[in-house]
Amino acid sequence: MAAIYLDSSAIVKLAVREPESDALRRYLRTRHPRVSSALARAEVMRALLDKGESARKAGRRALAHLDLLRVDKRVLDLAGGLLPFELRTLDAIHLATAQRLGVDLGRLCTYDDRMRDAAKTLGMAVIAPS
């Protein structure tokens, strides 16, 4: 089955109640595997720093239910060449990680507009359940 790649904006919605959280949970309920970059471990926890211990605990649980893919030299080299120029470095690493999945990538789940636009430019199927 094709993987669902979650970027950090989606993972945070699994840890903290936001308007899209329930729709995202429903969407993911029967979809496996769920993957992200190992980068998400730091990115998500930093996003939850000011949300309290229960949010951080929920963030750790959400991350534990994902297959976190290594950020290796090939991912970094690929990320370094991704366009558009305005693409932020961490987003480029997420996109490069997703791109490395090749045919095993089903959809990329993001709630970040710049990430969505860049992923579509790369030919990825993008979702944001709401």
Curated annotation (Swiss-Prot):
Q: Which GO terms describe its cellular component?
A: plasma membrane
Documented EC number(s) = 3.1.-.-
Q: Which Gene3D superfamilies does this UniProt record tie to the protein? A: 5'-nuclease (3.40.50.1010)
Biological process per Gene Ontology, one example term? negative regulation of growth
Alphabetical keyword list: Hydrolase, Magnesium, Metal-binding, Nuclease, Toxin-antitoxin system
Here the disulfide bonds are: none
Give residues annotated as binding Mg(2+).
7, 91
**Family the UniProt entry places it in:** Belongs to the PINc/VapC protein family.
Primary role: Toxic component of a type II toxin-antitoxin (TA) system. An RNase. Upon expression in M.smegmatis inhibits colony formation. Its toxic effect is neutralized by coexpression with cognate antitoxin VapB46.
Q: What is this protein called?
A: Ribonuclease VapC46
What organism does the UniProt record list as the source? Answer: Mycobacterium tuberculosis (strain ATCC 25618 / H37Rv)
